[in-house]
Amino acid sequence: MAVESRAVSTPVPQNSQEQELILVKVEESRSWGQKLKQSGSARSCQELFRQQFRKFCYQETPGPREALGRLQELCYQWLRPELHTKEQILELLVLEQFLSILPEELQIWVQQHSPKNGEEAVTLLEDLEREFDDPGQQVPATPQGPPMPWKDLTCLGAAQEFTHIQRQPLKKQLKPWEPCLPPKSGCENNESAIKKDISGEKSQRLSQEPSFGGFSEHKSSLEWQQGSAPGETLRRSPSQRASFSPVIFTHKLLANRDHPEPQRNLILSTNSVTYQKVPTEERPYRCDICGHSFKQHSSLTQHQRIHTGEKPYKCNQCGKAFSLRSYLIIHQRIHSGEKAYECSECGKAFNQSSALIRHRKIHTGEKACKCNECGKAFSQSSYLIIHQRIHTGEKPYECNECGKTFSQSSKLIRHQRIHTGERPYECNECGKAFRQSSELITHQRIHSGEKPYECNECGKAFSLSSNLIRHQRIHSGEEPYQCNECGKTFKRSSALVQHQRIHSGEEAYICSECGKAFRHRSVLTRHQRVHTVK
């Protein structure tokens, strides 16, 4: 595999002063990046820098060179090329764009789970297994009748640019609600009429919209289709939430038969992508907390559970509760053993589609998540996160009983069973219980007689891999256990322990009949026969 480049191409500074400034910023950013990595807050800060980069306005700087420099700085702080590989940076950009194209209802749900990459976002959506009432509503584009009012479309920057839309430089500081219209041309009279029309609709609309920090939040769902013809259907695009900018580009639908031809040509010449707003009467149910609207009251009720934390769907088996019935259905497959998703390669079945997707990577050998420290690759980002704790020494999971910490939650759960005495894994044959599933699997080989570990030298098979390792030392002659006192070596650690009792004088095995002590259990066993004969 080729060595991954971590460089991000940026415009070259025009003078030495700018170059020195950028170098200082890079060094400060690297130093701060290490602190963030240690404190565990890098994720939230990365999101903050992303928002600052996307919301940055030209009017915040005195000139174009300063604006470009500030954008470079914000982009560097967001994407962190000194910490991330080229593939990881691309993953961040793809994830951002993927979230932006989701329907509104899914956007909110996925963002609350904070996926770290596109694979995690897809897994969340597949686990949801719920069809929304209006995932991609088809709305007819009817040019007949009165023109529909338009909401504002916030400028989102390079990652969400709309092709063929001409963006003109602004001559003054615009207010959040002030439209950016095309430059004056021969149709000045038509433009003034357009401005008046848009301004009238805007003033009526602003009184009804909530305000957040001085900016109007534009929640409308926009219908888009490039080069659409009358009567064709348009696909709904989600609102671009959390992107407020003083530079607002307003696109007004004037290409209807009630306007003169010059007016229609003026608008369509500056915007070859046609938009259409879903009428508000089709979404009469509005959330009082976040302002999202829904077609049906049941959809609003389900959405409000995000804010209230209500979980009305309870499992009859274990009592666990869920906010959606689809979650409960997925959970109940644990108890029923139903596995509806089957691998076409090996036939193995799973109870969730996301589990099947992860399993398929075993067959494809795909390992897209690579460790920057040692280069080891993993099929899932969660595996990479756990692996990186080896390098960082991070152990975020702490036992409340004894304070011992662990790098994985599963290890903490197993450890806590020492304190609780819980043994959840029970053998169906003899009823013996174990703390870990691996112990149960090993035990069941006693009943089944299975010996999956075979010696390549002599063909002898064993039920435990540790037994095979010890056996192979017979062929290799390896004796890894050495006595510190005399230097003698042994194949097994137990043999070394017994040998060390010669030097220490320890006699660990005591006869309960006469009190005589022995170094080896086998010697004690032979001695006890003396008492048995009597």
Swiss-Prot record:
Zn finger (C2H2-type) location: 285-307, 313-335, 341-363, 369-391, 397-419, 425-447, 453-475, 481-503, 509-531
Keywords, sorted A to Z: DNA-binding, Isopeptide bond, Metal-binding, Nucleus, Phosphoprotein, Repeat, Repressor, Transcription, Transcription regulation, Ubl conjugation, Zinc, Zinc-finger
BP term (GO), one: regulation of transcription by RNA polymerase II
SUPFAM superfamilies (alphabetical): beta-beta-alpha zinc fingers, Retrovirus capsid dimerization domain-like
Record's GO cellular component terms: nucleus
Domain SCAN box residues, every copy: 50-132
Cross-linked residues, Glycyl lysine isopeptide (Lys-Gly) (interchain with G-Cter in SUMO2): K55, K171, K202, K252
TM ranges: none
Main subcellular location of this protein, as a coarse class: nucleus
Protein's recorded name: Zinc finger protein 397
Organism: Bos taurus
Gene coding for it: ZNF397
